[in-house]
């Protein structure tokens, strides 16, 4: 089983990036992208030892790490500042994310996500370099 991730890419489209932006330059010290595990059901035991279970509503959380000051980071900064509430106005952008893994013929598509977190500026690390930038998206829809 080959688990090589080399060649994976992420494409993001939104009002801030209407033509879409494909990220292929992964940082050296963070995961290029992560999709958090989610709880989809809850199981309990009733008084007479019978199983009681139900489905849980949940959201998907995708974190993308980028190299600071790269073209990818500069484009994501545009999206960050577009989506950050300023004054009395909020721009809640609908973001479409496509993740293409090496060896897969079709990408994983995530629709109507929202950029919920990002770094507004660089952070200097003690080893003399800038920290990688992380951008976090949340939503509920995966298109199959």
What is each residue range found by the language model?
Residues 37, 88-89, 140:
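Short alpha-helical interface elements
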Residues 53, 82-86, 136:
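Alpha-helix boundary/interfacial micro-motifs
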Residues 78-108:
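Short, acidic/charged, Gly/Pro-enriched secondary-structure junctions
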Residues 131-144:
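C-terminal or internal capping secondary-structure element at the end of a domain, subdomain, or sheet
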Residues 1-69, 112-134:
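Solvent-exposed edge beta-strands and adjacent loop segments
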Residues 64, 97-99, 137:
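Generic recognition of well-ordered secondary-structure surfaces with a strong bias
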Residues 60-86:
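Charged, amphipathic alpha-helical segments
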Residues 72-74, 105, 143:
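Residue-level signal for secondary-structure boundary sites
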């Amino acid at each position: 089983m080959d688990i090589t991730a080399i060649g994976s890419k992420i494409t993001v489209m939104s009002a801030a990036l209407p033509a879409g932006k494909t990220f292929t330059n992964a940082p050296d010290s963070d995961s290029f992208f992560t999709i958090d595990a989610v709880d989809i059901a809850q199981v309990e035991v009733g008084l007479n030892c019978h199983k009681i279970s139900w489905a849980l509503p949940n959201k998907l959380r995708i974190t993308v790490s980028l190299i600071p000051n790269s073209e990818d980071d500069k484009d994501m900064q545009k999206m960050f500042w577009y989506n950050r509430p300023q004054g009395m106005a909020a721009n809640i952008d609908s973001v479409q994310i496509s993740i293409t893994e090496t060896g897969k013929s079709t990408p994983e598509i995530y629709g109507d996500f929202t950029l919920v977190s990002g770094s507004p500026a660089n952070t200097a690390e003690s080893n003399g370099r800038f920290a990688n930038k992380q951008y976090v998206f949340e939503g509920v829809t995966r298109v199959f």
